Amino acid sequence: AAFDEACHGLVLTRHAIPYRDGELTAMRWEADPADRAQAPAGTPHTLVMMNEFDGYAEEIIDFASYFPTRPFDIIAFDGPGQGHAALSGMALEPEWERPTSAVLDYFGVESAAALGVSFGGYLVMRAAAHCPRVSHVIAFDMMYRLLDGLTLPLPCPLRPIADAVIGNPRPAWLIDAALRIAPRFSADLAWKLQQARHLTGLSKPSEVLRAFGDYTMEPLEGLIHQPCLVLAGDADQYVPFERLEDVRRAL
């Protein structure tokens, strides 16, 4: 209610998009007519904004208020495992082209640019690889592999060991026992595991690790043909800067 009150007067509408056995929350902010009239030829008419690991559609569409011009309609949505969808019990799924296509179908959009924020930087790549209606890609910023967020805070010598463990989380009982204890010493890890359970609907850390293994750009190599703008931070707390080379290779 507070968000809607703050946005009073904007050409912004809420939508409930049927998906699976539930609904995806979406928000659409119509283009500024003057900006659209002055936009160069070839400017996309629609920009779809993809959410993050712990975001809501309201949060991400507010990001668009900082755009210097708005020549396109902006659509932000909570996909499975995100925001309002997660609260309703709809778990995260790796085939991100499916909710993306559902959103484009609902609004009758034949072609759209797509921007992904944080974890959305991976999701937008997955959608682009399998949804040709995505015409342009912005990863703000890049995310090659979701599991990097668990290993990056570790000292460099320990990362290969951690990679091996989370890449093959067996025996499950040992992984579960270790990850019940480790969060006591790291508030960051405790939050990540709590949020991961919330997104996936899974209770055991070993199950979460196996599920998160699906979120990697490795199988997308050669499938993304759209123009891509990839941003990277050299002090990102979740994404190793050296992953930029892996992203380049995938593209």
Enumerate the language-model features and the residues they cover.
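Active-site nucleophile elbow and catalytic-triad environment of alpha/beta-hydrolase enzymes
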Residues: L202-L220, Q226
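Alpha/beta-hydrolase active-site loop
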Residues: E59, G89-A113, Y122, R126
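N-terminal cap/lid segment of alpha/beta-hydrolase-fold proteins
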Residues: A2-A41
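Conserved alpha/beta-hydrolase "acid-adjacent" motif
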Residues: Q237-R243
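Hydrolase active-site cap/lid region
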Residues: H130-R210, L231-A232
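The serine-hydrolase catalytic nucleophile loop
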Residues: F53-S65
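Short beta-strand/loop motif that positions the catalytic acidic residue
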Residues: I224-H225, V230-A232, D236
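Conserved alpha/beta-hydrolase
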Residues: F67-H84
